[in-house]
Structure formats: C-alpha cells, structure tokens
Amino acid sequence: MQNLIVAVVAYLIGSVSFAVIVSAAMGLDDPRSYGSGNPGATNVLRSGSKKAAILTLIGDAFKGWLPVWFVVHFGARYGLDDTSVAIAAVAVFLGHLYPAFFRFKGGKGVATAAGVLLAINPILGVATLLTWLIVAFFTRYSSLAALAAAVFAPIFDGFLFGPHIIALAIVVMSSLLVWRHRGNIAKLMRGQESRIGDRKKADAAAKPTAGSDV
C-alpha cells in the first residue's frame, strides 16, 4: 500500500507542467502552440523569455527531485526502501511525460530526470548534468545533449554503485527519454534539428514540429 501511495503522489507531482503554468503567468503563448510543441524549458526559451525558460527548468527539475528526495531521506520511518525510491523516480518521470492535468501530453523529461538523479545521489546527478552541458555547449543541440546524458546516466550509476534496484529505474527513465526523442533523432540525421536559443517562427500558428525540449 505504501508503494502505491508513493506512485500516485509522485505521478501527480510530475503532472504539474511548469512550462504551461509559467508561460501563462508571464503572459506568453502556450509552449504547446509553437516550436517543438513540447512543454519544456528549451521550447519556452524559443518564446524569447530566458526568465520563463529558467523558471520552467527549475520547476521541472524540482518536481523530479522532491518526491525522490523525500523517500530517500524519510522513507525508512514509513517502511519504504530502495524499491520505493525506484517507484517514485519512475512515477514522477511518467507524470511529466504523460501529465494527468494536461491531457497526458507532456514534455520529454530531461530536467525532471536531472532532478530525480540529483535526489538519488548528487554525484550521479552532477555527472549526468555535466554530460548534458558539455554536449550542449559544443553542439547547441539540446536533444543530442539529452540523448548523451540518457546513455551515460546508467553507466555512471553502474560505476558508482554497481547493481541495485534503483538502477533499473534509471534504465527505464533513460529508455523512455530516448524514445521521446525519436523524432529528434530523425531530424538530427537529416540536419534539420533546432538549436538551443532558436526563437519560434513568426508564423507561430503553424503546426508544431518535433523539436528538442527539456
């Protein structure tokens, strides 16, 4: 029963879409209506508002961090263990990808996954974030950086901690993140992928395409 409660609460926390909420609060267009069409920080940045993008990034990372951190640090007193941590991690991530509050149409989960990893272990989280930053800095492709981080996160975890149940959750999240970027992979191969900082087109009413997002 405890793990079911963990799953439901974590999923609902993950279902809060900061991209939509922040954009609405700041009088910006709905991020689902331009650019990649995905509610994430990278797409919000295409609105031209760095402040909104930063707030979205922080919010999405925080919601991933919160339930996992709580279970890691306070779970034992409620009979929770590493399995509960793994459940919280996957549930909050799924909440971001398929949010109940926004018709199950969410972002791609990079910032939320980063928050989850930081909660599991700060060293693991920082190593994965550095991977994203290095690739993003040299290529300016958010999607390519996300894919690199998704590949290396389970590797970093294996080197740091060896086999454990939480590693399975990390593999699941990484696999889902790569799956959510399948459109980006195709666009990268065609040389059509949007770069970080590209603004939305003047014809914002045009149908969104599958661009990068965090």
Swiss-Prot record:
Catalyses which reaction(s): an acyl phosphate + sn-glycerol 3-phosphate = a 1-acyl-sn-glycero-3-phosphate + phosphate
Membrane topology listed for this record: Multi-pass membrane protein
GO molecular function, one term: acyl-phosphate glycerol-3-phosphate acyltransferase activity
Gene Ontology CC: plasma membrane
GO biological process: phospholipid biosynthetic process
Pathway: Lipid metabolism; phospholipid metabolism
Entry's localization field: Cell inner membrane
E.C. number(s) listed in UniProt: 2.3.1.275
Transmembrane parts of this sequence: 4-24, 52-72, 82-102, 118-138, 159-179
Keywords of the record: Cell inner membrane, Cell membrane, Lipid biosynthesis, Lipid metabolism, Membrane, Phospholipid biosynthesis, Phospholipid metabolism, Transferase, Transmembrane, Transmembrane helix
One matching Pfam family: G3P_acyltransf
Quaternary organization: Probably interacts with PlsX.
Protein name per Swiss-Prot or TrEMBL: Glycerol-3-phosphate acyltransferase
Native source organism of the sequence: Paraburkholderia xenovorans (strain LB400)
Gene (UniProt): plsY
